[in-house]
Amino acid sequence: RDRLRSRGLGDVYKRQVIRLFPSRYIHIGGDEASRRHWKACPKCQKRMKEEGLKDESELQSYMIARIEKYLNDKGREIIGWDEILDGGLAPNATVMSWRGTEGGIAAARMGHYAIMTPESHCYLDHYQDDPETQPLAFGACIPIGQTYSYDPAPDSLGSDICKYILGVQGNVWAEYLPTYEHAEYMIYPRIIALAEVGWTPMENKHPESFKRRINNEIRYIRTKGYNPFTLSEQVQTSQTVDYAKKKIMLSLTSEKHPIDIRYTTDGSEPTVSSKL
């Protein structure tokens, strides 16, 4: 029953993790655990019955709470991915919210600290441009503008909730990154956008100013021997409709700066002499 303290995981944390990492926080994971093995395990089912646990989610939370108590007794605190919420949150745990923002917000509402790292904005191993033009990567496309647009602590949550949101984190998983140069290519410059997300209030963000600065930063990063992604020259369009004036306003932008965008309004192909 007390195997955690005498051997097994307790031994791993005591002899390896705690010795190697002097930090206050220890990340214990807790994500993507398939519970079908626990369903089929007689020992797991026996423990669930003994402890009055109604399902395997509660079994995971039971184990995480025991790990937390062990580490708290050693003067440490745990961080876990948002799945640790599923069967009930350990008393002092910090939640790292990756499956969207809901897990982090739920933890903050419960008075627990949260770190926001939603896959939709913070996963730097995902494509950053058209996959047809990029090295093999994981997941969907997350361009730098999407990362920059993220607001980890919106005013709508209220200050009583936002005070529990510690910040943001960028994640880079290396399955598709065989070299350091490839990792640099995926990390830079999106990590700079994420840094601004962490320290700049939403009302102080200026996308056009950031676009100018980030292009300068890319040039600087290259002078230091790194291998950053070159921002896309692809033109993005957005439109707004003024119903009162019966007009449609079309905006043409690009990640690249400076760049000349030429256009026509008669359906013909733009040329170097077309309007800017």
Predicted regions and their residues:
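Single conserved hydrophobic/aromatic residue that forms the stacking wall/gate
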Residues: 2-9, 13
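Glycine- and acidic
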Residues: 11, 48-54, 172-177, 200
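Substrate-binding and catalytic surfaces of secreted/luminal carbohydrate-active proteins
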Residues: 16
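Gly/Pro-rich turn-and-neighbor structural signature
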Residues: 19-26, 30, 34-108
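Hydrophobic/aromatic-rich, well-ordered segments within soluble, folded domains that form packed cores
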Residues: 25, 30-33, 188, 258-268
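Conserved alpha/beta catalytic core and glycan-binding cleft of carbohydrate-active enzymes
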Residues: 75, 80-91, 98-219
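Short, compositionally stereotyped local motifs that mark structural "simplifiers"
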Residues: 201, 205-276
